[in-house]
Swiss-Prot record:
Stated family: Belongs to the precorrin-2 dehydrogenase / sirohydrochlorin ferrochelatase family.
Organism: Methanocaldococcus jannaschii (strain ATCC 43067 / DSM 2661 / JAL-1 / JCM 10045 / NBRC 100440)
Protein name (Swiss-Prot/TrEMBL): Putative precorrin-2 dehydrogenase
Keywords, alphabetical: NAD, Oxidoreductase, Porphyrin biosynthesis
GO molecular function: ferrochelatase activity; precorrin-2 dehydrogenase activity
Pathway noted in the entry: Porphyrin-containing compound metabolism; siroheme biosynthesis; sirohydrochlorin from precorrin-2: step 1/1
Record-linked PANTHER family: SIROHEME BIOSYNTHESIS PROTEIN MET8 (PTHR35330:SF1)
Length: 206
């Protein structure tokens, strides 16, 4: 697999199952602009409240066990992406049918046959970091995500971006700019002093 970033803006997504995993993945897709239909036997108050405040979320009450393969295919074919988060048996069935219809499919229990992953990720300022352990250790993925998130929060990304733009205007060679940025990034004291100067300049120009 190749890691990519994807906007779900305007994409139609079916989520089968409304347990903790199904809800979590549905929320991530909604945040990215996707149109999400959740298929489940029942829905809790949390997801019902979310539906009230989000026009891109629809809840369809249905028992997947009672559907034939043909009925499931008729549902799956309407969507761009499929997420199945019920149990291993049903997930395998949905993955198989989705693949037959050449759909992007994700499963909470099955990695074989799936062709898109929603990994653990964090976003701080303009930096997005994701980690995937191929389903072997979600706990490790979570701890790595938290570690990186804390590191990014302690690093002034906006300041580095500001300096980078300034260097582009004043230093023509990319290699020279890279050396300067590296020294700035590694020197905490210099970084703090530079941050104060930038803030002083910005305040004086507002």
């Amino acid at each position: 697999m190749l890691p990519i970033l994807l906007s779900f803006e305007g994409k139609k997504v079916a989520v089968f199952g409304c347990g903790s995993v199904g809800k979590r993945r549905a929320k991530k897709i909604l945040k990215s602009g996707g149109i999400v239909d959740i298929y489940s036997k029942e829905f809790d108050e949390e997801i019902k409240k979310l539906k009230e405040s989000n026009k891109n979320l629809n809840l369809i009450e249905i028992d997947i066990n009672q559907l034939s393969d043909e009925e499931l295919k008729n549902i799956i074919m309407k969507y761009d992406f499929i997420v199945t988060a019920i149990n291993d048996e049903i997930n395998k069935r949905i993955v198989k049918l989705a693949k037959e219809l050449n759909k992007f499919v994700n499963s909470s229990t099955k990695t074989e046959g799936v062709n898109f992953i929603i990994p653990a990720y964090t976003e701080v300022d303009e930096v997005i970091f994701s980690i995937y352990t191929k389903g072997k250790s979600p706990l490790i993925a979570k701890h790595i995500r938290i570690f990186v998130e804390n590191y990014l929060k302690s690093t002034d990304i906006n300041m580095i971006a500001y300096i980078r733009e300034f260097l582009k205007e004043t230093i023509p060679k990319q290699k020279d700019r890279e050396k300067i940025l590296k020294k700035i990034f590694e020197n905490e004291k210099f970084r703090e002093e530079l941050k104060k100067l930038i803030e002083k300049w910005e305040n004086g120009n507002h």
